[in-house]
């Protein structure tokens, strides 16, 4: 592709070195993202898009550009930043490399115009493809983590709010909803910001209860809506397709309506009477059994569930539960979280084995 321009007047070594370095940078960043799409997300479409862009970059990476490389004479090889040595979680790793790819493509777009006009156009288009890839990665990660989260902590007012939530996260929790009905908005905003940072540090999803505006303000992973809150379609219009939307349901009609309206997950309950929903009669285990048979999206049994009754809830068909008091009021939230997770994992494993055995006899 570069041969037609081998006699171009723009073959100054500096420009060729810039193009060579940024082609390397973009290809390396794409390979890092591709590996996570392939092995971490098990997403063939996302991994395939990364591979396709790498191959397109390779076509532009001609021998002419490679020959201009002067690593010993590159003053930039000695420039470092402390942040380059640290990656706290996979989200940060991906974000850093996506930014690296986007910056490299912008450099290629601008300097490419001096080397070959077609190069500038090609890399501009690729840069927008990377933006789309980044958005798709966020959506895929959130949905995958939701699917893999059997335990959902819904907070209640507590002087130990942050300590309790962090203890649960240390116990393996991957899904947290901040629920606060009485505090001022300034307090809610401050608490939500801190909880979101904490959740993301531990690789967990952070959901805001009720408030779409606060969910956007703190960059939450989603919002949970009650039956009296705004319609799902309205929330989706504000939040976009990247964020999760959950809906509380108390009966089959509400469940089917929430699914039809596009909820990403639903709450099923209250299973037992609970002060958190003092105005709601218990839906009981019958509703849990109905959800087990009919819910086509992730659902969480919720309402009065604790270590003493979780077996009954699981025996009714639940594989995911949402917990409030049993963790928020626990003396040892980490241990209680681990207990719930062990019970949920045990049931999921048994049902997976039963399903495979059943299929083998078909």
What are these regions (language model features)?
Residues 14-17, 121-124, 128-167, 233, ...:
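N-terminal amphipathic alpha-helix/helix-capping segment at the start of soluble metabolic enzymes
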Residues 90, 147-162, 243-249, 301:
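Active-site mouth loops of central-metabolism enzymes
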Residues 189-210, 227-250, 279-307, 338-352:
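Alpha-helix-loop-beta-strand connector modules within alpha/beta enzyme cores
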Residues 179-181, 227-235, 267-279, 310-343:
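Glycine-rich phosphate-binding active-site loops on the catalytic face of alpha/beta enzymes
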Residues 218-225, 246-293:
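Glycine/Thr-rich beta-alpha phosphate-binding loop at enzyme active sites
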Residues 2-24, 28-142:
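Structural preference for solvent-exposed beta-strand-turn elements
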Residues 156-169, 209-213, 250-257, 306-311:
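Short, acidic/polar
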Residues 101, 153, 168, 176, ...:
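Conserved, mostly hydrophobic/aromatic
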């Amino acid at each position: 592709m570069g041969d037609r321009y081998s006699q171009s007047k723009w073959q100054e070594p500096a420009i060729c070195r810039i193009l060579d370095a940024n082609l390397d940078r973009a290809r390396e960043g794409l390979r890092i993202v591709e590996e996570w799409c392939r092995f971490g997300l098990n997403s063939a479409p996302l991994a395939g898009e990364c591979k396709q862009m790498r191959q397109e970059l390779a076509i532009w990476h001609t021998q002419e550009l490679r020959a201009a490389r002067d690593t010993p004479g590159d003053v930039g090889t000695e420039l470092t930043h402390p942040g380059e040595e640290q990656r706290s979680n996979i989200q940060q790793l991906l974000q850093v490399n996506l930014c690296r790819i986007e910056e490299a493509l912008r450099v290629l777009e601008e300097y490419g115009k001096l080397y070959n006009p077609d190069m500038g156009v090609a890399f501009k288009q690729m840069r927008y493809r990377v933006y789309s890839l980044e958005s798709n990665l966020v959506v895929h990660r959130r949905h995958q983590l939701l699917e893999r989260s059997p335990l959902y902590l819904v907070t209640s007012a507590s002087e130990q709010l942050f300590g309790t939530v962090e203890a649960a996260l240390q116990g393996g929790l991957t899904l947290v909803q901040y629920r606060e009905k009485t505090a001022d908005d300034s307090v809610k905003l401050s608490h939500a910001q801190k909880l979101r940072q904490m959740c993301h540090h531990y690789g967990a999803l952070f959901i805001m209860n009720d408030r779409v505006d606060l969910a956007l303000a703190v960059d939450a992973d989603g919002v949970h809506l009650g039956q009296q809150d705004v319609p799902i379609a309205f929330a989706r219009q504000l939040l976009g397709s990247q964020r999760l939307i959950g809906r509380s349901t108390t009966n089959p009609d509400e469940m089917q309506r929430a699914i039809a309206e596009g909820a990403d997950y639903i709450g099923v309950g209250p299973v037992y009477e609970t002060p958190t929903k003092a105005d709601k009669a218990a839906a009981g285990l019958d509703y849990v059994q109905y959800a087990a048979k009919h819910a086509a999206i992730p659902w969480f049994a919720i309402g009065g569930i604790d270590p003493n009754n979780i077996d009954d809830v699981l025996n009714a068909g639940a594989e995911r539960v949402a917990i409030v008091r049993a963790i928020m009021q626990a003396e040892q939230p980490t241990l209680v979280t681990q207990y719930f997770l062990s019970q949920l994992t045990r049931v999921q494993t048994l049902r997976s084995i039963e399903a495979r055995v059943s299929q083998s006899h078909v």
